[in-house]
Amino acid sequence: MATQSYVTELQAAPQASQPPQAPPQALPQPPPPAAPQPPAAATPQPQYVTELQSPQPQTQPPGSQKQYVAELPAAPAPSQPATPAPSPVAQQYIVVTVSEGAMRASETVSEASPSSTASQTGVPTQVVQQVQGTQQRLLVQASVQAKPGHVSPLQLTNIQVPQQAIPTQHLVVQSPAPGTKSGQVSLTVHSAQQVHSAPERSPVQANNSTSKTAGTPAATVQQLQVHSVQQSVPVTQERSVVQATPQTKAGPVQQLTVQGLQPVHVAQEVQQLPQVPVPHVYSSQVQYVEGGDASYTASAIRSSTYQYPETPIYTQTAGTSYYEASGTAAQVSTPATSQTVASSGSVPMYVSGSPIVASSSSSEAGASNSSVGAGGNGGGGSSGGGSGGSSGSGAGTYVIQGGYMLGNASQSYSHTTRASPATVQWLLDNYETAEGVSLPRSTLYCHYLLHCQEQKLEPVNAASFGKLIRSVFMGLRTRRLGTRGNSKYHYYGLRIKASSPLLRLMEDQQHMAMRGQPFSQKQRLKPIQKMEGVANGVAVGQQSTGLSDISAQVQQYQQFLDASRSLPDFAELDLQGKVLPEGVGPGDIKAFQVLYREHCEAIVDVMVNLQFTLVETLWKTFWRYNLSQPSEAPPLAVHDEAEKRLPRASLVLLSKFQPVLQWTKHCDNVLYQGLVEILIPDVLRPIPSALTQAIRNFAKSLESWLTHAMVNIPEEMLRVKVAAAGAFAQTLRRYTSLNHLAQAARAVLQNTAQINQMLSDLNRVDFANVQEQASWVCRCEDRVVQRLEQDFKVTLQQQNSLEQWAAWLDGVVSQVLKPYQGSSGFPKAAKLFLLKWSFYSSMVIRDLTLRSAASFGSFHLIRLLYDEYMYYLIEHRVAQAKGETPIAVMGEFANLATSLNPLDPDKDEEEEEEEESEDELPQDISLAAGSESPALGPEALEPPAKLARTDTRGLFVQALPSS
């Protein structure tokens, strides 16, 4: 079969010496499988994109294939007819390949008659553009229908080729073997323009029909049009390939119009972003990590003070700006680039606290494989569209040392430690760099803890978070600011954004006061709003500096509180049949109960929000502190409302009424016990040191606040209130100390080497000698002491956790106090056991000290913890036996301590007289588990106030059986 090929070169004279040479960059592309092959073509006919510097004799390819080559010179300068030598001169080709069917015998078309009846068919297209690489191709696949069908033109408009480095333009048309039935093919190229070039050669038309072929029917003409294709990217070679594949049946009209296809260089797109001076990023600071890899190696960041000769990857030039001061990747809508590292949208790369936008949008040039897509030399395939870079899930990841993971299909960038994308985005959304400002380092970390709790994330420690901050906002400096003795580290050059909610949170911290109804039930876990004029004359500075207030970080500490606990109901006020004071009516009694209930609920709310300083404000508000100070400012609206509900005169009268005093005492015990359980729900659970310190500072100031707020209130009410508040403060101090000891001992109990050393030292202790010395005071049975000794050693050897040790101690208390359960002597028996436990443990520590045991420090810490925890257990057992709260039990001892004067010399004589009347007391006591110990009398276990040195009696003796 005959195949005709026409070569038209507008630049050089024809030479018929050599066959066409395929360049090294020829792209072999077999015809589509759907095209039927004639008998003469046994193998698929490859297509070659050739560079024709001089015309050669035409070789006849098999089948009815036509090849049209049109060369458009970029300048009128004549070209050399010699064989092309390797040169950097770039060329641009437009290659059109048309697969058509055989021509009928009745439809012969001569070679000289380029005009024929055209039948245009649908053309599914795909364009892949590579910028600044080796080539840029425009691939258009046209499906030629077997039968003449509807018209589906292809129009590619406004593609211009600049003059830069494009001396010649070739138009190559290849027509492979025809199918069974097809039409004539006509190629029309209109206005192939050159930008800034010599006179245009347009239009260039190559409407060449196929020649006569024996036994082959003629075909109708299929016309493809290319109109004014503009290209504004400086490239080495630009090629357009139009390939037509036959289809079996004619389809409906399919029209695809691509106008204004302009590949944009990265510099031209990102140039609109502002430029910020930042250190360079060198290639040794960037690693390429395959997608899906979870481990990233980190190396030291290079110092910005030393000038490295290595060329930086990203340079700050006027035409290329990769940095943005405080923006995000979302601010750049659809930037186009040829070097993408992921296929799932924009990839922010954080350098010096600003993202480098390196993204490719699929909506700019196409969205599917059947549409026009922007490709690139970043790894995108010729069949993938839209992503440009590596298509699919094989996206890589760039890691800046000490920074974040960039890219990957999941669009995640994580710190080399444990930073989540939400944390990085949170930092960028809430903080910004600025000159002349600073932010406390502790405040920033507290904000981070708040963020972690909201996002259900595991926070890192302060040191790791500091590295995270410096990686996001590079170049930060640290300064120690503040007065002498109260200075703190600050990040200099960092501030909270004006749009950040953290700024409003800090403002609320600086203006802590109640707004509106101070006694109404406030919603839990909400920051208390500020009010105009700080209440009760307490300045903002005094509230924020005098006490460690962590109200701004309330939410990250909520996990350590039991905020779900509500205030129990108070009992009704029992008048006990007494007559109301003069001037007080039943309405005043009811108003006092309602107001006091609201007052206690408000205290619970501020405590749950860790706004400890507001407790003093609430006390002053309820007890009308301002109304008793004539020199103070006019009373606030809240005082006016409270005055309407319960006048201050009636409040003073009720403060002397005994039933009101008893009811107030009961309410305070219930309130303070609930507050203890809210603040410290588990004494062994780790609590942040900041929260512990805030609680201790609050306990230290509690009594002075109350005394100051209740000025001019009757002394009877003041004593009741101070006793309960003192017990509450003492409980908070003890529980925080116990918690601190528990965390210190936890580390010891988890250290295998220390446990082994403690066992070795404990085995050297002469427990027989210890028992002999302690029995004179404790009078404990030998078998009980031996059992406790063995249990202690076994538990220590098993390396049990702190919680297991606590369970063992609780079991010891239960076994020892079991015989006294339900008896009236249970409280004194429990106190006696606590004294014996403490004394016996001190004897063991004494022996370890004398032997210079290596583990003395560990034993001392363990002993302190166990003694304190025993105190905690006994306190709760006694309160349970009495049916009261632990706060109420401790309040009784507080009242007893204030009523006794240990320095009174007259009491010594009375105590000496009492010693002489105690000879009839029995001799022995044994608090053994399961023993036949009788119940203790109410007064039998009272120790003598003074014991003679020569008296051989035990300090504690057993009481006679009660009848």
Swiss-Prot record:
Pfam families: BCD_RFX, RFX1_trans_act, RFX_DNA_binding
GO terms, molecular function: DNA binding; DNA-binding transcription factor activity; sequence-specific double-stranded DNA binding
Stretches with biased composition (Pro residues): 20-41, 75-87
Stretches with biased composition (Polar residues): 107-119, 181-196, 204-214
Entry keywords, A to Z: Activator, DNA-binding, Nucleus, Phosphoprotein, Transcription, Transcription regulation
PROSITE patterns, per the entry: RFX_DBD (PS51526)
Location(s), subcellular: Nucleus
Main subcellular location of this protein, as a coarse class: nucleus
Biased composition (Gly residues): 373-392
Record region (Disordered): 1-88, 105-126, 174-218, 361-392, 899-948
Biased composition range(s): Low complexity: 42-67, 361-372, 932-947
Listed Acidic residues bias regions: 906-922
DNA-binding region: 423-498
Modified residues (Phosphoserine): S54, S962, S963
Gene Ontology cellular-component terms listed: nucleoplasm; nucleus
Coiled-coil annotated spans: none
Similarity comment: family membership: Belongs to the RFX family.
Function of the protein: Regulatory factor essential for MHC class II genes expression. Binds to the X boxes of MHC class II genes.
Subunit annotation: Homodimer; binds DNA as a homodimer. Heterodimer; heterodimerizes with RFX2 and RFX3.
Protein name: MHC class II regulatory factor RFX1
Species this chain originates from: Mus musculus (Mouse)
